[in-house]
Amino acid sequence: YQGVKSSIERPLDAFDPGAKYHIPGNTPYTRYYLARVLQYQFHEGLCKAMDFQGPLHECSIYGSQIAGDQLRSMLALGQSRPWQDALESIIGTRELSGTAMLNYYAPLKEWLDNKNKDRVCGW
């Protein structure tokens, strides 16, 4: 339970998850979850390749020749190599990790922690 409730009365037969195609279509959602984790790992890896110094959320790979070349090189592998090799070519490891996502959102988490200090959740 997340402590969130509807702003209006809801009938017992309401089925909001059905509005997302993947639910009634029985489409596996794991790929989207993994893609989100990888997105942050790729971003962090490309920022490191550019020698970016600073918080991850301030790094932009837009217009970077270095980041573009590295990403292009990884994508050129296609299916010729295991996906772990492609991952390693960008981030330097073959492991999936949520650390890059945590690093990206660290300033927001710190702000939220400070903002909510001494607050008690009602649920």
Predicted regions and their residues:
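C-terminal, non-catalytic "cap/extension" segments appended to globular domains
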Residues: Y1-W123
